[in-house]
Amino acid sequence: MYTTKRFQQLLKEFEVALLLKFSKQLLLLGKIESYLNNGSSMKHEECKSQIYDCRMAVKIYVCSITANKSTNLKHFVRLFFLLGDSERVNLCIKRLIYTFIGSINSVIDKKEDIEQELYSSCMHCSIMSPKLQKVMLAQKSLILNKVFDYLFFLYGLSGTSILYTAGDHIRKLDFKDSGFITPFFQLLLLVLLFTLTFKSKHSLNAYSLTASQFSGHTVCNESSLKPNENSCDLNLSRTATIKLESAEDDACQRVLGLIKSYMRPRTLEELKLEFRFEHKSVQDITTCILDEVDGVQMARVLEINPDAPILAF
């Protein structure tokens, strides 16, 4: 069984390694494009002097996309081991992992064509052919898709705080020589990340939780179900009592979402969750929670990340 601290450390390694790889790939593509686009206007000797640099950039790039496969698989294998045996790993998380690996493999499958085209262009100091331009554009698109797949993968595991960290890394990257990501595009990327973070924290904040709130016995009141008002502290270590003074149409789904997202990977019986309500109208919430959690075995989910400053949904 993994420890939360070890799990967070793994995610941090994963985040830094991959985001830097993606940024380097984009920078290399920009450098290669610069060599090829400038080659036609150079004198022959000037061009020859850059052939080696151009080919080295191609080689590093191809090695980079090849290395991504083994690097990512290594991290994912470690992630599986830390999460526990296969029966205890949430099926949704597994799907995310396999989807992410698939997006990486889609880049690797094209590496032979990329290498051949780029090497040929380097040697002849020629500008990129229409075919090569399409290949380069496709590569950039795939890399950016990987970045977003990766961010949302981590977002699903660690909550909104991962977007702050990823945003910090992106903000520190230097894309001025990439020939592709302009400062304006970089700004748009950051705006998107923080917009997603803001939305997840404010438009869906039926509950706002911090790690320090996961202790002692807690009772949630009516205000906890109303967005943009007081947060609700829940203790999910062994027993949780939820006291609702009134019900809303989506109250069941929000309570269920909390349990599915932040419960330790134990069965519902082991947790001995207890639900108490003030009004008869909310008795349906109890049925919804028990049926859905137990029916699809969603009681086995990830432990809350104690290092996140705030988690909301």
Curated annotation (Swiss-Prot):
Has a role in meiosis. The chain crosses the membrane at residues 147-167, 178-198. It comes from Schizosaccharomyces pombe (strain 972 / ATCC 24843). Its main location: mitochondrion. It is a multi-pass membrane protein. This is Meiotically up-regulated gene 100 protein, mitochondrial. It is found in: Mitochondrion inner membrane. Keywords: Meiosis, Membrane, Mitochondrion, Mitochondrion inner membrane, Transit peptide, Transmembrane, Transmembrane helix. The keyword Transmembrane applies. GO terms for cellular component: mitochondrial inner membrane; mitochondrion.
